[in-house]
Amino acid sequence: DVEIILVDDGSTDGTARIADEYEVAFPDIVRVVHKKNGGHGSGVNKGLELARGIYFKVVDSDDWLDREAYLKLLARIKEFCGEKESRKIPDLFICNYIYDHLDEGKQRVMDYKNVFPEESMCDWNGIRHFRPSQYLIMHALIFRTEVLRKSGVKLPEHTFYVDNLFSYQPLP
């Protein structure tokens, strides 16, 4: 059900060895690619190029996933993308997230309850207004892989803060 693509872009801290160990331990799930460092965008581009799944989610090296929330998300994806051929599968799943400010010892919860109907699918007409403090970042998004590819999104290399390109360019 899940494919994990680990993109090692020239890490010097033992990441490459650890990634390779995961690939050996979980060969049906984990694929590793080693490449020259090209920055965050380059790693995302490589992952998208190699992705074989219906959906694509970026998880950076400093991100973490809550197991219970992750399993709930997988169940929701399966529910919406069930075996009913007549059903249109969603182009995008949007998830709440927690932003950890480790330096300050603070957390900020970003939820979208006021924007999107909870636990259901909607179209553009079902979206309400964002608060000024709310925005979509790549870590809250799970795009259908085909949507990303058709959009032609390609993140710049050696550039920080490329979330807006990834988050908004694929939208109609």
Q: Which residues does each PLM region occupy?
A:
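Nucleotide-sugar donor-binding/catalytic module of glycosyltransferases
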Residues: 1-172
